[in-house]
Amino acid sequence: MARMQESADLLKCSFCGKSQKQVKKLIAGGGVYICDECIELCNEIIEEELGAAQAEADEEKEMRLPRPSEISAFLDKYVIGQDQAKRVLSVAVYNHYKRIKAEEAAGLEGRRKKAQDEEVEISKSNILMLGPTGSGKTYLAQTLARLLDVPFAIADATSLTEAGYVGEDVENILLKLLQAADFDVERAQHGIIYVDEVDKISRKSENPSITRDVSGEGVQQALLKILEGTVAAIPPQGGRKHPNQEFIQLDTTNILFIVAGAFAGLDKVISERVGKKGVGFGAKLETKDEKESVDFFSQVRPEDLVKFGLIPEFIGRLPVVATVDNLDRESLVKVLVEPKNSLVKQYQRLFSMDGAELHFEDEALEAIAELALERKTGARGLRAIMEELLVPIMYDLPDREDIASVHITQDCVTDGGEPEFVYSDEAKESA
């Protein structure tokens, strides 16, 4: 009995030397032993080293800011055309985050000293995007945020009203960004906010309003501070502010605002200024195609936007102007097939989950694009057309194991014809 006890005492941890009696568990393997305490210590060391390596990798990733050419190339994978807008956006976004990184690297004291010595302080450059509905404005902004891995929020300017009136306060825009950042204030302060339909908050006339314009000029005035940079008090639950409510303080200085709208009618304002509009018997009459071929938005000036209904202070806080063009039929066909996550690829993936292939004739794609042009919905309307076309097929497909592939023809799009089905070999043999 004494010998057995002695042999038990001989079993020791090969790392710390403690006997089997001194530890809770001793694990054997290949002539060596390790106790539970040493296992726990090893785990702590590994976790600490992995954590440090991960933190270093995260810091390196955070420091890596893509160049304008890389940003534009990334946008090319997802957005068709709009080359000029991509270049403007790429440079603006690059400069915005380059400014932030430089300031963070210098620190507050260094930044003050630099401002005193060099008298150069780089101001924030928010972006104004002009272009028709369905031309890719929102998608460009979303894709930028995805590349930069920053929080992104979309707000509709038409739902906003001046403080004290029924509707949303402008601070609710910031709440959406906080929610997108999981209420991480530091991360939210480097995010992107996209304000759509800003043309709908233009004031009713070019002259300053005597009466209150709570959904137009009033909203523009309310947006001024957060566009320029201020510490805003955000109610965590949204809604109106109450005196006894706790607020989250959010600095908007480094938030990039992309403000966009279709600006229907702005082309007329620009054409009057540039003298394209003739008067009298000698005036040249332009056809509809000729009018559309003139790219008026690229010639926009601040005075045109003032005449349209934006206040000068608002325009001054949006120094970068990017214009997007109407998509023609050829561009819409490319939108359907070329981007990394194009609609055709998405529906082909859905069909493959039910064991069938999906193919489109070139003529069918052109007919879909033509339909979007007729509806004046641009790229945004393509999905609705695809749904109308494919829902009846997708309804029956899960019950039809005999279908190997589906071919969409022009007749399917234009006249509601039946698609062409190719059946599996097993189905043919059984038939």
From Swiss-Prot:
SUPFAM superfamilies: Glucocorticoid receptor-like (DNA-binding domain) (SSF57716), P-loop containing nucleoside triphosphate hydrolases (SSF52540). Keywords: ATP-binding, Chaperone, Metal-binding, Nucleotide-binding, Zinc. GO terms for biological process: cell division; proteolysis involved in protein catabolic process. CDD domains: RecA-like_ClpX (cd19497). GO terms for molecular function: ATP binding; ATP hydrolysis activity; ATP-dependent protein folding chaperone; protein dimerization activity; unfolded protein binding; zinc ion binding. GO terms for cellular component: HslUV protease complex. The keyword Chaperone applies. Residues 1-54 form the ClpX-type ZB domain. InterPro entries: AAA+_ATPase, ATP-dep_Clp_protease_ClpX, ATPase_AAA_core, Clp_ATPase_C, Clp_protease_ATP-bd_su_ClpX, ClpX_bact, P-loop_NTPase, Znf_CppX_C4. Gene3D superfamilies: 1.10.8.60, ClpX chaperone, C4-type zinc finger domain (6.20.220.10), P-loop containing nucleotide triphosphate hydrolases (3.40.50.300). ATP binds at residues 132-139. Zn(2+) binds at residues 13, 16, 35, 38. Belongs to the ClpX chaperone family. ATP-dependent specificity component of the Clp protease. It directs the protease to specific substrates. Can perform chaperone functions in the absence of ClpP. This is ATP-dependent Clp protease ATP-binding subunit ClpX. It comes from Corynebacterium aurimucosum (strain ATCC 700975 / DSM 44827 / CIP 107346 / CN-1). The gene is clpX.
